[in-house]
Amino acid sequence: MRRATLSLSLFAMAALISAAQPKPEFVFDLGFEYCFDNREFDAGGETFIESSTIHAARLTPAFGVALPVSDNVTHRILAGIDIFKDMGASPTSEDLQSSVNTGLFREMTLWYGLDASLPNSTLKACAGIFPRRFSVFGSSDTPSADMPGRDIPTLFISDALRFYDSNIEGILITSSRPGSYYEVSLDWLGLFGSRRREQFIVQSYGKGSILPWLSAGWVASLHHYANSFEYSGVVDDVTVSPFLSFSLDRLFPCLDRTALTFHYIQGIHQDRRNSTGLEPAFGGQATLEIRKRNIGVKNEIYYGMGQMPYYDVPGPDGLPYGSALYRGNPFYRISKGLDWKAPGMYDRLEFYYQPVVAGFLNLRLAACLHFTRNGFEGWQQKLCLVVNLDNFRIRNRS
């Protein structure tokens, strides 16, 4: 009898412990992006950007396990693959071996994720190799006026880099509450090696509401561009941009969105190999966005010093630092072959059509015109389609 009672007690305890343990659930994360971006800059002599066409598609499936330890906290581990194809980049040889598609698989993605709902805020974190679209520095423009990151100048990350360098290798932490959003990330861009520089970039963004029509925030980045096995020479590139954003919707009720944002942009640059010391660069930017239903206009005007002073400076390997050092829009150089400290103007004017199709689908057709103090530099015709199915759970129906 005692043995039976003891066995029943142990069985009951085991059942209670098993019931208390979180049950893992299979999850998947799927992203698809199609981009057509025709760039014509002959009008300005291709001073800042060469004419070219980006026409490519990407699929990023990932599968894993979610472990909800409570109603407020969930841990996730996922692994996937980045599948990418530049349209028209097929092999020309008739040899079967050269026609296989293994080259479409660019790199593995694998990451740990945390979702935590706190009493007054939501905390999310990722560590590993994960899609850049989880960050405001990698997410595409959406029709939502409340979407954080709409006010990030292209100085911090160019459209092309946002598309081609689609993964973060490091860590991302975000925090949000009603009316505010904050994030910081570390992206390890290069491991010290032969012909490969050690480099990393830290980026941060924050925005919070002060009044119903006024918000304040910041955008910041620190890029450390260091040595390779063959060459020595370190460059530090720091950019900080506090901003104020005004919602003018009440003044223009006939429009769906009217927003005016003012950025102060402070750059601090240093080329240690050339002993430049800390070189500051000052500037300001005003951004006006107007939207009515599916049609909008966004105009960004920057005036100030060049924010990419070493773009054309030869590095220790004899090649200009260029886009390897500066990950933003090259028009923020302001001048080429001139003193970067002389202030100048850059104007980016975009007309777009962006219908609301579905919450997980973003379609955007745009024409983007670029102007400097020399006049019209060129324009882009863009069509982008983005599909994001994030952290969907595969539930067991049995």
Where are these regions (language model features)?
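Positively charged n-region of N-terminal signal peptides that target proteins for export
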Residues: 1-4
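Hydrophobic h-region of N-terminal signal peptides that target proteins for export
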Residues: 10-19
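A short acidic, glycine-rich active-site loop
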Residues: 69-71, 158-164, 336-338
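Extracytoplasmic loops and strand-loop junctions of Gram-negative outer membrane beta-barrel proteins
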Residues: 43-47, 93-96, 153-157, 187, ...
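Short, solvent-exposed beta-strand-terminating loops
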Residues: 38-39, 127-136, 302-316
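Exposed, low-structure sequence patches enriched in small/polar residues
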Residues: 33, 56, 177, 181-182, ...
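Beta-barrel outer-membrane channel/assembly domains of diderm bacteria
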Residues: 20-118, 379-398
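Surface-exposed coil loops of outer-membrane beta-barrel proteins
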Residues: 121-207, 222-224
